């Protein structure tokens, strides 16, 4: 299985990079995983609704350019469906069963995802009703993908 994580913004925090690299290494036994970092759109602090839409649309264009037509897209969004780790594992397992060998997870920037990206998404996933920094979500997502593969293989994992 090929898994891409398309995300806005560069990861600067060393501790997050180390955590992500550790889970990518662990995941290499199960799947090929790539993280595609795209530049965030520079914007002042106090944006109007129209300016926010413009920023999200520009970031959205960059995201969509990195999504191949044959991939199953899962957008991380607060309004998405919440799943347990077992349900995420089941989603990944079913996609593999039905011949979907490519999954792309999308993490937006600080303003979220554009309407165009949300329309392209095959499903929307929420980890919580709380808002998390998009940099931290990368680590949480990679850990949950690793956990999903462990669950699907019947291997032990921490509950």
UniProtKB/Swiss-Prot annotation:
It is an enzyme of class 2 (transferase). Keywords: Cytoplasm, Methyltransferase, rRNA processing, S-adenosyl-L-methionine, Transferase. InterPro entries: Alpha/beta_knot_MTases, RlmH-like, tRNA_m1G_MTases_N. Its main location: cytoplasm. S-adenosyl-L-methionine binds at residues 76, 108, 127-132. Its EC number is 2.1.1.177. GO terms for cellular component: cytoplasm. It is found in: Cytoplasm. HAMAP family: 23SrRNA_methyltr_H (MF_00658). Specifically methylates the pseudouridine at position 1915 (m3Psi1915) in 23S rRNA. PANTHER family: METHYLTRANSFERASE (PTHR33603), RIBOSOMAL RNA LARGE SUBUNIT METHYLTRANSFERASE H (PTHR33603:SF1). This is Ribosomal RNA large subunit methyltransferase H. It comes from Bacillus velezensis (strain DSM 23117 / BGSC 10A6 / LMG 26770 / FZB42) (Bacillus amyloliquefaciens subsp. plantarum). The gene is rlmH.
